[in-house]
From Swiss-Prot:
UniProt keyword Metal-binding present: no
Subunit structure: Part of the 30S ribosomal subunit.
GO biological process: translation
GO cellular component: cytosolic small ribosomal subunit
Residues annotated as transmembrane: none
Name under which the protein is recorded: Small ribosomal subunit protein uS17
One matching Pfam family: Ribosomal_S17
Origin: domain of life: Bacteria
Known function: One of the primary rRNA binding proteins, it binds specifically to the 5'-end of 16S ribosomal RNA.
């Protein structure tokens, strides 16, 4: 019996911290409809992701995927940098 291919979760967000070695903090924003009033409100989540080459900088838009736990709080890995932040 063949194993079914498990779909890998991928998310896109913005890097808000790159101070840790080989780790970035990514802010994921989503819009959720309020259950009573019906207005769409922004909700956000911060996730730690593994950045093996330390290539990300603050403000970059990145794509991350779920992976095995790397540490207590880190279970996501960097897939690609979608858009670089503007240098000031």
């Amino acid at each position: 019996m063949a194993e079914a291919q498990k779909t890998v979760r991928t998310l896109t967000g913005r890097v808000v911290s790159d101070k840790m070695d080989k780790t970035i903090t990514v802010l994921i924003e989503r819009r959720v409809k309020h259950p009573i009033y019906g207005k769409y409100v922004k909700r956000s989540t911060k996730l730690h992701a593994h950045d093996e080459t330390n290539q990300c900088k603050i403000g970059d838009k990145v794509s991350i995927r779920e992976t095995r736990p790397q540490s207590k709080t880190k279970s996501w890995a960097l897939v690609e940098v979608v858009e670089r932040a503007v240098e000031v």
